[in-house]
A protein has these predicted regions:
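PLP-dependent amino-acid enzyme catalytic core
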Residues: 2-7, 11-505
């Protein structure tokens, strides 16, 4: 059971920032309640009511180390936690959990910059946010005197699942169930999930793709917000504002590194190229820009599933298209959840609600020319094929000995194209995963035939490139498989009700 944290609840605070639903501005909650809820009533996503309240002097932020920057940024987004508790949460979340002291190191490669976001315990960018979310959520429960046990439901296209399972493992008062597509993720990603320990963790393969799993999870939030007495649902996907906000910090961290190395002057704009399918990672960049960070363009890099590229070019969102399984599976998504937040900021709640209704009923929507023009002030989109991504991996390794994964390769190939066509600003490519999570595709890009056995392929990649296999990935082959269930989408509800009721009789 949770009990109110009176130490922090009685702390004097400034005027609170409210959170509202993207589909109903009259639905208002505190920041901690938004973290607890995950998804707003009626299916909307929580956003800050007033973006101007997030403004800060970025120059005062980037003098700090990573944890110091996180404290300032978290404090803006989550004011009802109070300064002392935010500081405690950040220290618990980021101390001694990442192999790099700077958490997200920036590396200069071939005249561009790669922001390495894979230095955490599951070797993917999701670790940055999912190291913080369990602490944000458990403290939110105390602040709101929330008595229910929390059951986290999370759909994953690969990396969120392992990071969420690891982050929430054995966290008191919280259980987690992850749903992943049974085909279309790498064997390493699958093993990370199905071998995860923790008495409060479950992982289920879903027959279908990520969109099937994500739609199923969203539907459960509407149908069974309390699947049994004493248990409430929440989310660890980036639909949860507590998952999204920690990702804002590394945009500031990248800018700080460029300034500290003398690569840019204070005030210079920086472009960020982001490989994304669900629009969360790039949405964090938009929020960083709203806070006052000098962000130039946010370049959305898509694979063959190019629904976002078409939308950013034409304003037409159409999920009624062929779904492709690619070598960058974490981006194999046709329903991009976080785009709803951008629609709200550009179009308002009523229009956003209408667009989402149209998407649900017809599979598409079209925004106005004026709305698209506003979006194009900040975003541009490109798509690349597997072949272009593979060529980028091979070319960059041959020229610089730098090895990147298949998702980063899509972003690198996009930045290649963008540099030729558009901008002279410094360009930071967000690198979202270790190449050792996708060894078969990376080996193929380097001209080697993969064996089909991820363990052997990791050893071969290490030998070929002179790089080291990350310890967390090496360890998965020694762990026992604990989660073996493969289910149909229409079984998700019964599974969740059963899991929620365990131990409640």
């Amino acid at each position: 059971m949770y009990h109110k944290n009176t130490k922090y609840a009685t702390e004097k605070r400034d005027k609170m920032l409210n959170y509202i639903s993207t589909r109903d501005v009259n639905h208002k909650v505190s920041s901690s309640q938004a973290v607890l809820d995950g998804l707003a009533a009626g299916g909307g996503l929580y956003v800050p009511e007033d973006l101007s309240e997030l403004k800060l002097d970025y120059k005062e932020v980037i003098v700090e180390d990573y944890r110091g920057m996180a404290k300032k940024i978290f404090g803006k987004f989550f004011p009802d936690y109070g300064e002392e508790l935010i500081g405690d949460i950040v220290e618990r979340s980021y101390r001694d959990k990442f192999k790099a002291e700077e958490i997200t190191p920036l590396v200069s490669v071939d005249g561009r910059y790669i922001l390495e976001l894979f230095c955490g315990p599951t070797c993917a960018f999701k670790d940055v946010a999912l190291s913080a979310l369990p602490n944000l959520m458990s403290e939110a429960a105390k602040l709101n005197d929330f008595q229910d046990e929390i059951l986290i439901l999370t759909a994953t296209s690969g990396d969120t699942g392992s990071a969420a399972l690891h982050g929430f493992s054995d966290v008191s008062g919280i259980r987690i169930a992850v749903f992943y597509p049974d085909k279309g993720i790498s064997e390493t990603q699958r093993l990370q999930m199905v071998t995860q320990s923790g008495a409060n963790t479950k992982a289920f393969g879903v027959r279908g793709n990520f969109d099937d799993a994500q739609s199923g999870v969203k539907r459960l939030f509407q149908e069974i917000p309390r699947p049994c007495e004493g248990v409430s649902l929440s989310s660890a996907n980036s639909i949860n504002i507590g998952r999204l906000v920690p990702q804002v910090v590394y945009y500031f961290a990248a800018y700080k590194s460029l300034v500290d190395e003398g690569e840019i002057k204070l005030g210079d704009d920086v472009d960020y190229t982001v490989p994304t399918g669900n629009f969360g990672d790039i949405m964090a960049g938009y929020l960083a820009k709203q806070m006052g960070l000098p962000v130039g363009r946010l370049i959305c890099a898509s694979n063959k599933n190019d629904v976002l590229t078409e939308f950013l070019e034409t304003g037409h969102y159409d999920k009624k298209r062929e779904f492709y399984k690619t070598s960058s599976p974490s981006m194999d998504i046709l329903v991009s959840s976080n785009l709803e937040r951008l629609l709200f900021f550009v179009c308002g709640a009523e229009k956003t609600k209408g667009y989402m209704k149209s998407l649900a009923e017809t599979g598409e929507y079209q925004i106005s020319e004026e709305e698209l023009a506003k979006i194009k002030n900040d975003f541009v989109g490109y798509a690349c094929s597997d072949e272009e991504g593979s060529a980028a991996i091979g070319r960059l390794f041959e020229e610089t000995s730098y090895v990147m994964d298949t998702h980063t390769a899509i972003a690198w190939a996009v930045s290649d194209r963008d540099l030729k066509e558009e901008s002279s600003a410094k360009n930071v490519v967000l690198s979202t995963a270790s190449p050792y999570k996708f060894t078969g595709a990376v080996l193929a890009a380097l001209g080697e035939k993969a064996s089909g056995d991820d363990r052997s392929d990791m050893e071969r990649l290490a030998e070929l490139t002179g790089t080291e296999i990350p310890d967390p990935l090496r360890a998965i082959f020694e762990r026992e498989v604990k989660h073996k269930d493969i289910i149909d989408v229409d079984e998700m509800k019964a599974i969740v009700v059963q899991y929620a009721g365990e131990g409640k009789e």
